């Protein structure tokens, strides 16, 4: 009998949450439809309720092979509740990367979707001159998305960061082997792209031009001080 009361309380709490969720079903669908109409326009998508009743599957007419979900989340402690959540960014971004790689060779480089950034392009070079090739590949991806998946740009999902190894910045720690360089920023009026020349101008003065000397300075009587 001691355990009966906690069990009853848990059952009542679960029933309340469940009934509350079901009670919001119609309201949630209307909220999602308003959101979709505002983002993509009326009659540009199909929407189907999941069997769980808590989310809706949406397919844009322009992209019939891709289906994403939308759901309404409620948090009584949040000032922004209820809010709409979706896996749109992940589904469309990963698909765009997959399709781009089918027809564009990246060599030893890699391009991935990262939900905290959008896209990350990984490359290893020995000089800024070598950086031109991976930079052009990243620009090729932007051109590909602009042509095939412009909805990503419309939704502000084309931020690209280039993670560079092989060259190092002055004063960098021994374990600090990465240079992070933003090359594309999604803004309300389109994309802000950093040119290759701008990247070189920014990084050139900061790069190490010689390997670290663990023994410190070396002096030569005939030629003076060398590093």
Regions found by a protein language model. Name each.
Residues 1-24:
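Sec-dependent N-terminal signal peptides of Gram-positive bacterial secreted proteins and lipoproteins
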Residues 66-89:
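A short, surface-exposed beta-strand/turn
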Residues 43-72:
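Exposed beta-strand-loop-beta-strand "reactive/processing" segments of non-cytosolic proteins
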Residues 22-46, 93-101:
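Short, non-transmembrane alpha-helical segments in secretory-pathway proteins
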Residues 56-59, 79, 119-122:
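Generic recognition of long tandem-repeat/solenoid scaffolds
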Residues 6, 20, 36, 57-59:
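Terminal accessory regions that mediate trafficking to/through membranes and regulate activation
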Residues 48-53, 74, 110-117:
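Short, ordered beta-strand-loop transition motifs
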Residues 93-94, 102-227:
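Extracytoplasmic electrostatic interaction patches
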